[in-house]
Every structure is written in structure tokens, then in C-alpha cells.
Amino acid sequence: MTTETKSADIQLIQRILPHRYPFLLVDKVVEIDGYSSAVGIKNVTMNEPHFQGHFPGTPIMPGVTIVEAMAQTAGVMLGVGMDIIDSELLIYFMNIDNCKFRRKVVPGDVMKMHVETLRGKMGGKIFKFRGTATVEGEVAAQAEFSAYVDLTGEKST
């Protein structure tokens, strides 16, 4: 069996995730391998509202938004990998483990979110992921997180 590597532009991402500005934290997903792994991209800009208060004069992307960007990348991976596009897909955090922040992420950075599925199966509701966020090849953050997949039905048109 061959696995086709896919990608997702912002239009497809918005057909999968319910998040919108200012909380849509994935600009594109450049690699999706089924529902087992993916690589997302976040172009970090000064226009993001969290930089007004985190921190004035020294803008640093909050760690929680880095972890959320990894989780959103995992959500896109599940949407494409499990063919649940244009649905009422919601994914809820259940826990975050072994989270470490290693490098600041600042405006102008291009952050890559690498996620892989550790547990979960096609049609399942509980998944565990490992995520690593990098900037210029340096690890910025890493975490393991579990999520509950809630597919409540088709979106109305």
C-alpha cells in the first residue's frame, strides 16, 4: 500500500478547522501523510494581537499559542487524513504532557509545526500526538498532547 503525501492551503484549512482570526494559527500544511504525520507552517507577524501585551517592546509568541499551533496542525492532518472536510469537526484538548519551551518565537519567524500521531485509529475519537515546533531548524517547543475528536455532523450550506 502506498501513502500519498498531501498538503493543505489556507482555504482547505478553513474548511477543516472552525478557528478564525485571531486564533487561526496555521497558514498552510506542507506535508500530510495520512493521519500519521504532518508539517504545518505559521508565519509569525507583529500584526497578531497577543504581541500587544506579550511583551510590549519585546514581542514574544506566548507558549500556549505555539502549542495551539501544533494542535491545529494535528487537526488539519486528521481532517485530510480521515477525509472529514466540510464537517462540524471540533477537536478538544484532553491533556498536554512533557511540554518544553526551548527558544523564543518572535515576529518575522517562520515556525514549522511537526506533528505525529502516537495513538488513535481511523474513525476513533481519542488521539495522542507528539508535536515539535521549530524555527530555522532549532526546536522552539515540544509537547505530547491528547485530543477528543467530536464530529457532530455536516456543516449547513
Curated annotation (Swiss-Prot):
Its EC number is 4.2.1.59. One of its GO terms (biological process) is lipid A biosynthetic process. It is found in: Cytoplasm. GO terms for molecular function: (3R)-hydroxyacyl-[acyl-carrier-protein] dehydratase activity. The active site is at residue 54. It catalyses: a (3R)-hydroxyacyl-[ACP] = a (2E)-enoyl-[ACP] + H2O. One of its GO terms (cellular component) is membrane. It comes from the Bacteria. Gene3D superfamilies: Hotdog Thioesterase (3.10.129.10). Pfam families: FabA. Keywords: Cytoplasm, Lipid A biosynthesis, Lipid biosynthesis, Lipid metabolism, Lyase. NCBIfam families: fabZ, PRK00006.1. Belongs to the thioester dehydratase family. FabZ subfamily. Involved in unsaturated fatty acids biosynthesis. Catalyzes the dehydration of short chain beta-hydroxyacyl-ACPs and long chain saturated and unsaturated beta-hydroxyacyl-ACPs. This is 3-hydroxyacyl-[acyl-carrier-protein] dehydratase FabZ. The lineage of its organism: Bacteria, Pseudomonadati, Pseudomonadota, Alphaproteobacteria, Rhodobacterales.
